[in-house]
Amino acid sequence: MPVFTIRTNVCRDSVPDTLLSDLTKQLAKATGKPAEYIAIHIVPDQIMSFGDSTDPCAVCSLCSIGKIGGPQNKSYTKLLCDILTKQLNIPANRVYINYYDLNAANVGWNGSTFA
């Protein structure tokens, strides 16, 4: 059930139509979780600054039941920053990604929880 959220000051018109699908496929491969459970949420057109500059930037989060931790997070960060640089022209040094390892009992889906 990984959920990847991107909040960015990049305008909606500059977000490629393929970004959702590309992120889903890459995160499924990286996490080993089925693509059917991966959710992507892109919030463009935000009023943001990073380092006192309003150049393109992003603040992201990846939430998952498991598959979150030190070495994995480094791998995810490289993967996700590469995608954001390639598809949204956001340099990797203008991206923050917060990681959250969720308890299965605290995640609801399809009328129940994952616990």
Curated annotation (Swiss-Prot):
Belongs to the MIF family. Keywords: Cytokine, Cytoplasm, Immunity, Inflammatory response, Innate immunity, Isomerase, Secreted. One of its GO terms (biological process) is innate immune response. It comes from Xenopus laevis (African clawed frog). Pfam families: MIF. It catalyses: 3-phenylpyruvate = enol-phenylpyruvate; L-dopachrome = 5,6-dihydroxyindole-2-carboxylate. InterPro entries: Macrophage_inhib_fac, Macrophage_inhib_fac_CS, Tautomerase/MIF_sf. Pro-inflammatory cytokine. Involved in the innate immune response to bacterial pathogens. The expression of MIF at sites of inflammation suggests a role as mediator in regulating the function of macrophages in host defense. Has phenylpyruvate tautomerase and dopachrome tautomerase activity (in vitro), but the physiological substrate is not known. It is not clear whether the tautomerase activity has any physiological relevance, and whether it is important for cytokine activity. Required for normal neural development during embryogenesis. Ubiquitous. Detected throughout embryogenesis. Detected in adult spleen, liver, kidney, heart, brain, intestine, testis and lung. This is Macrophage migration inhibitory factor. Homotrimer. Substrate binds at K33, I65, N98. The lineage of its organism: Eukaryota, Metazoa, Chordata, Craniata, Vertebrata. One of its GO terms (molecular function) is dopachrome isomerase activity. It is found in: Secreted; Cytoplasm. The active site is at P2. Its EC number is 5.3.2.1, 5.3.3.12. One of its GO terms (cellular component) is extracellular space.
